[in-house]
Amino acid sequence: MTPTELAKSRLETTYNRFAPFMQCIALYVIVFVLSALGFILSATEKKAWGEALRRSASWVLYATLIVHTGALLVRMSLMDRPFVFVTNLYSSAVFIGWGCVILGMVLERIFPLGVGNAVAGILGMATTIVAHNLTTDDTLEMMEAVLDTNFWLATHVTTVTLGYTATFVAGFLSAVYVLLLCATVVKDGFTDPKPPSLGGLLSFGAAAGGVVGIPMVLLWFFCTAAAAKFEWVHSSIPMVVLVVTGGAAAFYAGGLLFLKAGDVAVDADGKPLATGQLPAAAKPLAGMALDADKVKVFGQMIYGVLCFATLLSFVGTVLGGIWADQSWGRFWGWDPKENGAVLIVLWNALILHARWCGMVKTRGIAVLALFGNVICAWSWFGTNQLGIGLHAYGFDTRLADGCTNFWLSQLVIMGLGMIPAVYWASATRRRAAAAPVVLVPVALIEEALAPTPGPSVVKKKKRKK
């Protein structure tokens, strides 16, 4: 064995013992917890604590990114493939997570709200857990002959996976937006002086369930994925977490709905609340409610990320066609993987054109971007389960079940995002929408009835101007 081979063997042994991506999972959990707590405290009166936690999450995220980047570089060195990060499904997961973290950090730098850190933590944790569930006996396995070309692996595959990255980031930003929208429904439901209608109660109940249900689903997903692979996580943990958190979420949401429907809310002294006053149970959500500034920021973030997703997906798909022409003698063959790639391009382009044409605004973009998660997951993993085509890697029950659960969760969040605006718009907008239509403005009537000023008065007004 040459000295170079010996050094590489020692490097691989150290890499396997340290398990850098396993360390990243714990660090991403810390980032997400700090970001979530910071965002919640920033929405209350403890803004200084919220800002401190947000900055702490950023520093932990920087450290985690260093570990994640170092692990990718070590893998590249061990495989002797310069500038090639993706060689199999496992490496695609860890690379997509790396891209999501960088994009989240950029968003946090531009919009220091804690949202970028939270999305980076969620996606970094999720992708590394997915990668761990995709591990085989050897994650540095040999490449298939048809894929053994560094140029196309460094261009087409990298660009396409970065398109996946941007699409997922836009989708998870949209999920956070829907979460805040649900908090807005709860807040405005209590501040609306009108008696609740049946539709209002249904929307209020769905929002109250969603504002606690979305975090619960994320927690259950991560616990299930961890229990499936990590020996130190007992198999009953996901069910225990689901029962405990689900019960707490149902109790909280049911309590809010009872207060809204029964009009029995009281203050700390036990006295009935005045009309439009928030009960104590709903105050934690009041600061999370959307306002004009938050809606504008989320619209800018989701739109900007979708632009990058469209560009990267389009360029990557075209490069894939050129590679297919060189390898298989045809540019396009309607292979399931190729269809999945073009679906991402078409869907992201559809969202952008809908916005440019004024057909949708921030909420519409968010709901459509959530379905982009469904399409992206289908292109990434779903097409591999069909067992046909040149990109199929065989059916995997874990991937099939995981994709199905993920798709259902995105459809539920989309449903919450489509709560009618009349139930979550601000009180001012509700009053404006309910105001009677006046064909002749009052100002014109007053102007017509007012006495006509004389010439001298008109001249004086002109001189003042």
Descriptions of predicted regions:
Residues 1, 18-46, 52-81, 85-141, ...:
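Hydrophobic cores of alpha-helical transmembrane segments in multi-pass integral membrane proteins
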Residues 144-148:
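Segments that form or flank anion-binding pockets
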Residues 186-198, 291-301:
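Hydrophobic, small-residue-rich membrane helices and short re-entrant helix-turn-helix hairpins
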Residues 437-465:
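Long, low-complexity, intrinsically disordered cytosolic termini of multi-pass membrane proteins
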